[in-house]
UniProtKB/Swiss-Prot annotation:
This is Bifunctional protein FolD. The keyword NADP applies. The lineage of its organism: Bacteria, Bacillati, Cyanobacteriota, Cyanophyceae, Oscillatoriophycideae. SUPFAM superfamilies: Aminoacid dehydrogenase-like, N-terminal domain, NAD(P)-binding Rossmann-fold domains. GO terms for biological process: L-histidine biosynthetic process; methionine biosynthetic process; purine nucleotide biosynthetic process; tetrahydrofolate interconversion. Catalyzes the oxidation of 5,10-methylenetetrahydrofolate to 5,10-methenyltetrahydrofolate and then the hydrolysis of 5,10-methenyltetrahydrofolate to 10-formyltetrahydrofolate. One of its GO terms (molecular function) is methylenetetrahydrofolate dehydrogenase (NADP+) activity.
Length: 292
């Protein structure tokens, strides 16, 4: 295929569509419940990238009618203090979703904090209870990025059942839950990772190839089966030889676009979908807590 025939999986456009759907849903639920849905975001320290992500999430909340409760703590905040805040938010009737913005300063135990969140308010879908529900094929709050990938494939009517899917990356944030979601839709799954031998021979088998490894432009055209669906979860800031900064994914976009049938852009692919699924989880909690 030539580069001009590789179609884009436009996450940005779909995220806007989902936001409009959520806006309508909230307008229907608000009179019954008597208040808007609420999302509490906890940020520790002054990581500039995290600050941008939090601001984007708060702006997205405002667009759909979710009230956001920002909680910004200094970098030296203790584990105990944060756990106490989470416990308060668990009990707060205005709050339907709780999000801990990662990464955290090194002295904090992120996993322990995530475990403190009420599973029914777990906006990121990372609590062991919700991951366990995913393993069992039960309904629950799903991890935002993998859920965003699946929703994007669905929107473009990309058939998953019976396909060979390769997920490069095994993190609890993306790789593992996404593999389970693809399996749930009857794909045949391979998970590749840093210890995988002869990675290219595996990725070339993929009808659906997902890159989630955090290595800029790592997946090249030679690693991709012609006509494959390529989903790029990575987002990396690199400095080009001319000194300009650029955001790129884990896939060499220009090269792979000449081989793939579909490809996600970076930015504008999976990033907006992750935020859309976060909002959706918050509204699901809002509806579920009140059984409306």
């Amino acid at each position: 295929m030539s580069s001009d025939t590789a179609a884009l999986l436009n996450g940005k456009a779909l995220a806007k569509k989902i936001q409009l759907e959520l806006q309508t849903w909230i307008q229907e639920l608000h009179p019954k419940i008597g208040r808007p849905p609420g999302l509490a975001v906890l940020m520790v320290g002054d990581d500039p990238a995290s600050a941008v992500y939090v601001r984007n999430k708060e702006q997205a909340c405002a667009k759909v009618g979710i009230e956001s409760f920002g909680n910004h703590f200094p970098a030296d905040t203790s584990q105990e203090a944060l756990e106490a805040v989470i416990e308060q938010l668990n009990q707060d009737p205005r709050v339907d979703g709780i999000l801990v913005q990662l990464p955290l300063p090194p002295h904090l135990d992120a996993v322990a904090l995530l475990h403190k969140i009420d599973p029914n308010k777990d906006a990121d879908g990372l609590h062991p209870t919700n991951l366990g529900r995913l393993v069992r094929g039960e309904s629950g709050l799903r991890s935002c990025t993998p859920a965003g990938v699946m929703r994007l494939l669905e929107e473009y009517q990309i058939k998953v059942a019976g396909k060979q899917a390769v997920v490069v990356g095994r993190s609890i944030l993306v790789g593992k839950p996404l593999a389970l979601m693809l399996l749930e839709e009857n794909a045949t799954i391979t998970i590749a990772h840093s210890r995988t031998q002869d990675l290219a021979s595996i990725t070339r088998q993929a009808d659906i190839l997902v890159a989630a490894i955090g290595k800029p432009e790592f997946i090249t055209a030679e690693m991709v089966k012609p006509g494959a669906i390529v989903v790029d979860v990575g987002i990396n800031r690199i400095i080009r030889p001319d000194g300009t900064a650029q955001l790129v994914g884990d896939v060499d976009f220009n090269g792979v676009a000449g081989v793939a049938q579909y490809i996600t852009p970076v930015p504008g692919g999976i990033g907006p979908m992750t935020v859309a699924m976060l909002l959706r989880n918050t509204v699901l909690s809002y509806q579920g807590i009140h059984n409306t």
